[in-house]
């Protein structure tokens, strides 16, 4: 699709979103066609909710998020087939795999293990592996990435190439508020079991999160080497574990010292060469 065509789609969707109170299941014509085209672009990986520039900055295509939101107004509830024992679900978003056969899967080039759930408009790149997991609408999963058992990739989340999302990992989705950016895991990251990255935080390339690390916008990210405290972004090639920080001189009502509070700790930085040659368990040993 040409830049002119994309600009035309964006214009229609922006206008429809501004007038969204009048968009419903009866809406036909260019609004419905534009939303369907936008969802098809997302589903095929030809458009992304967020894109990384050469300087590392991420640009959010808000109009694509708006297209996803408009689809909820346009689509009525319907039966979704495919449950165990011929059971069904009741939803507005069909499966990405609806009506797929062998040819579709071979062309797509990724593995979809039984009981994984991928909603329409999520893109899964070739050589990715989906264990029984959940990938929400508008998300992007890069080439060679493993989404392990019970991991969740939230709406519009961006997962890079050769990422490992371990068992039970949660990557938060962001559709609203509209100005919020999606949660982003860049290329070659390892996210340890049961960790959570949410609220539009960014884990930069090559980073390793140990098991049970939780990072949201208000989470303190502490560099052990420097004492620097940052929020919302883990630098490239960082090794991060769960930790805690003292509450200063604060005391509780009973006069006892206040409890330490959770933080994420950058215990070391590694270069790309070391990261590629060193086992994850070895990196996490202190």
Curated annotation (Swiss-Prot):
Q: Which Pfam families match?
A: Hexapep_2, THDPS_N_2
Q: Where in the cell is it found?
A: Cytoplasm
Any one GO BP annotation for this protein: lysine biosynthetic process via diaminopimelate
**Stored InterPro entries:** DapD_Trfase_Hexpep_rpt_fam, Hexapep, Hexapep_transf_CS, THP_succinylTrfase_dom1, THP_succinylTrfase_N_sf, Trimer_LpxA-like_sf
For this chain, one GO molecular function annotation is:
2,3,4,5-tetrahydropyridine-2,6-dicarboxylate N-succinyltransferase activity
The reaction(s) annotated as catalysed by this protein in its Swiss-Prot or TrEMBL entry are: (S)-2,3,4,5-tetrahydrodipicolinate + succinyl-CoA + H2O = (S)-2-succinylamino-6-oxoheptanedioate + CoA
Give the family per the record: Belongs to the transferase hexapeptide repeat family.
**Subunit arrangement?**
Homotrimer.
Q: Record's PANTHER family?
A: 2,3,4,5-TETRAHYDROPYRIDINE-2,6-DICARBOXYLATE N-SUCCINYLTRANSFERASE (PTHR19136:SF52), MOLYBDENUM COFACTOR GUANYLYLTRANSFERASE (PTHR19136)
Question: What is the official name of this protein in its record?
Answer: 2,3,4,5-tetrahydropyridine-2,6-dicarboxylate N-succinyltransferase
Q: Which gene encodes it?
A: dapD
């Amino acid at each position: 699709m040409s830049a002119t065509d994309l600009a035309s789609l964006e214009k229609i969707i922006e206008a429809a979103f501004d007038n969204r109170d009048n968009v419903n299941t009866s809406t036909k014509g260019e609004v419905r066609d534009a939303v369907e085209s936008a969802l098809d672009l997302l589903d095929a990986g030809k458009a992304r909710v967020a894109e990384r520039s050469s300087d590392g900055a991420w640009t959010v295509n808000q109009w694509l998020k708006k297209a996803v939101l408009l689809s909820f107004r346009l689509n009525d509830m319907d039966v979704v087939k495919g449950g165990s024992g011929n059971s069904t679900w009741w939803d507005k978003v069909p499966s990405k795999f609806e009506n797929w056969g062998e040819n579709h899967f071979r062309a797509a080039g990724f593995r979809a293990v039984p009981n994984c759930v991928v909603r329409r408009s999520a893109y899964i790149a070739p050589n990715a592996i989906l264990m029984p997991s959940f990938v929400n609408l508008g998300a992007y999963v890069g080439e060679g990435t493993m989404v392990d058992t019970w991991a969740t990739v939230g709406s519009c989340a961006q997962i890079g190439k050769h990422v490992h999302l371990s068992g039970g990992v949660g990557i938060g989705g962001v559709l609203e508020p509209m100005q919020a950016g999606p949660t982003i895991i860049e290329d070659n990251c390892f996210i340890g079991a049961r960790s959570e990255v949410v609220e539009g935080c960014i884990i930069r390339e090559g980073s390793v999160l140990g098991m049970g690390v939780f990072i949201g916008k208000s989470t303190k990210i502490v560099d052990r080497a420097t004492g620097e405290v940052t929020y919302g972004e883990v630098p490239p090639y960082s090794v991060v574990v769960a930790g805690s920080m003292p509450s200063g001189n604060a005391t509780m009502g009973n006069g006892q010292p206040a409890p330490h509070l959770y933080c994420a700790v950058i215990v070391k930085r590694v270069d790309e060469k070391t990261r590629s040659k060193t086992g994850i368990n070895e990196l996490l040993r202190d």
